[in-house]
Regions:
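N-terminal secretory signal peptides that target proteins for export/translocation
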Residues: 1-4
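Bacterial N-terminal signal peptides
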Residues: 6-18
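Structured extracytoplasmic
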Residues: 23-175, 182-189, 193-278
Length: 278
């Protein structure tokens, strides 16, 4: 089973899995929805293959009295499944090959700001799942039985204590909601708000920058190797420093992901005894 990583800094993760048919004749309970999401996560952990896709990122910083900073980056994004040394678990690793920065060839392959988000595909932001019930409070929004095609909406908020925080995927007090497609029981949209988020960690004698983070993720079904997985199609983030700060600053990030493909390893034999190319 893939290792699930804690939700740290700007990380965000994927909710994927096999389509599971909703029960049309019976309104699901909160417990049943959590069970379905746990099954989706387990399917993702064990079945999602290594993939690559087109990534388009717009990163901005807006500060009062200063010109805006804008960076547009186009890359080939890769999500690679790496087995552990003992072959018992796997970890999903993010890689990217930057193709252009602001329309020009890149001078380096390290993505830079002004605003960054990492870890979006790396593991286990299971905010709506059975294994996070000790860390979260869940509320199922009232379901309109006359509109069976409307998404189920689950609201959540963290319940962090000194005893449970170490095992919680959300390490900062946060709240949000997810929208779940009733036909497939897959999450199609995630909203997360963290009122006091560490935007920039402390460095030496410089205090950290604390502020509000608002994060949204949209998911879409993608066929990979004959199986359907719900992958991020759009990720947006809006950070603002605390209102008491002298210079109000906003950090914005928007990434779109298109043209997903399963990674394939091919080998061909070259004439003359040359080594095969992989």
């Amino acid at each position: 089973m893939a290792a699930r990583l804690s939700f740290m800094a700007l990380s965000i993760v994927v909710f994927l899995g096999a389509p599971l048919c909703a029960q049309k004749s019976k309104t699901p309970t909160m417990e049943e929805i959590l069970q379905r999401q746990e099954a989706n996560l387990n399917h993702y952990d064990t079945r999602v293959p290594s993939v690559f896709c087109d990534e388009h990122v717009i990163s901005q910083i807006v500060e009062s009295g200063q010109p805006d900073e804008n960076t547009i980056t186009d890359s080939v994004f890769r999500l690679k499944r790496i087995p552990s040394a003992d072959q018992t678990t796997t970890t999903l690793v993010e890689l990217r090959e930057i193709k252009s920065v602001n329309g020009k060839p890149p001078t380096k392959q390290h993505m830079e700001g002004p605003t960054l988000l990492s870890g979006a595909f790396e593991g286990g932001l299971a905010v709506v799942s059975l294994n996070q019930t000790a860390c979260m409070s869940y509320t199922l929004q009232r379901i309109n039985k006359k509109r069976p095609d409307e998404p189920y909406v689950v609201r959540f908020s963290t319940v962090l204590t000194p005893q449970n925080t170490e095992d919680c995927l959300l390490q900062e007090n946060s709240k949000g909601r997810v929208f779940i497609d009733p036909a497939s029981m897959q999450i199609t949209h995630l909203e997360l708000t963290t009122p006091h988020h560490v935007i920039i960690p402390a460095i030496s004698y410089v205090a950290p920058v604390i502020g509000k983070r608002e994060l949204t993720v949209d998911y879409a079904p993608v066929l990979l190797g004959g199986e359907t997985f719900w992958m991020p199609s759009t990720i947006s983030m809006h950070n603002t420093n605390d209102s008491g700060t002298f210079h109000m600053t906003a950090w914005l990030f928007r990434a779109t992901y298109r043209n997903y493909h399963k990674m394939e390893v091919t080998t061909r034999i070259l004439p003359g005894g040359d080594a095969p190319v992989q």
